[in-house]
Design a protein with these regions (language model features):
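Amphipathic alpha-helical segments typified by the pilin-like N-terminal helix
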Residues: 1-32
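Short, well-structured segments within or immediately adjacent to enzyme catalytic domains
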Residues: 30-248
Length: 248
């Protein structure tokens, strides 16, 4: 299965000045990714009655490289076969050309190098790179919408300029090997909602966001939501757990 996103840079020990350069390049890459995703998302809405795409579709069918039918999951960022899902963390793969935004988003989406700075504390999910961007699951019908689930319409939003569609994203994992309760690890993640702590405030303690009106900005963390399981990793939420602020 093709991987559109190239592998991230190898993890090496670098001087503080070079880590700063990594941070700057991460900011530029996140900005470019969110800008392109936002533009592609706007085109998708215009051609689909202004209704948002699903976060995921279970039991989605596809054709593999050999022309054989396969079953898997179509996430907002690409398609993963059931065979890939059973390959184990860090060995999974997905095909971005079969995601709902394929054809709307240019192929210049790049992996975010900031994950490499966390060295042994980072656990990759896929072998084909680290997008580092999450989609608003509230817009996309929930984490696992059914075939008849309706996603939100753009016209349902009370103030599109204050509704986040995309943001820098990651989570702390302590339940999938090699992570554990005694060794929590940072991993790439792909969605935000009203309950989970999955916003990654990696741009100088703020998160980069793309709003529903097409604008982009930065938002700070609500400190009451900070995930303290990994020192120096800024994971949390924009608003208290249970709040739909910035979500609809």
């Amino acid at each position: 299965m093709a991987c559109v996103f190239v592998m991230a840079l190898a993890i090496v020990f670098l001087a503080p000045g070079i880590w700063k350069a990594y941070e700057r390049s991460s900011l530029a890459i996140a900005a470019a990714n969110i800008r392109q995703l936002s533009a592609g998302g706007a085109q998708y809405l215009a051609e689909n009655n202004y209704r948002y795409w699903k976060f995921r579709e279970n039991g989605a069918t596809s054709i593999d490289a050999g022309g054989n039918p396969v079953v898997g999951t179509r996430y907002w960022f690409g398609y993963e076969s059931n065979g890939s899902a059973s390959a184990g963390e860090g060995h999974r793969s997905f095909d971005a050309s079969q995601g709902p935004l394929a054809g709307y988003v240019p192929k210049g989406i790049h992996p975010d190098p900031s994950f490499a700075t966390h060295a042994s504390a980072f656990k990759p999910k896929f072998k084909c790179g680290y997008l580092g961007i999450g989609y608003n699951v509230v817009l996309g019908g929930g984490w696992s919408p059914g075939p008849k689930t309706k996603t939100m319409s753009y016209w349902q939003l009370s103030d599109p300029g204050k509704v986040v569609v995309f943001t820098t994203c990651a989570q702390v994992n302590n339940f999938q090997s090699p992570a554990s309760t005694s060794h929590p690890m940072l991993e790439e993640f792909y969605g935000i909602d009203q309950n989970e702590k999955t916003v990654h405030f990696r741009a100088g303690k703020v998160a980069m966001v793309g709003f529903a009106d097409g604008s982009a900005s930065f938002l700070p963390m609500d400190e009451s939501t900070r995930d303290n399981r990994i020192k120096g990793v800024d994971i949390g939420r924009f608003a208290p757990v249970g709040s739909f602020k910035y979500l609809k």
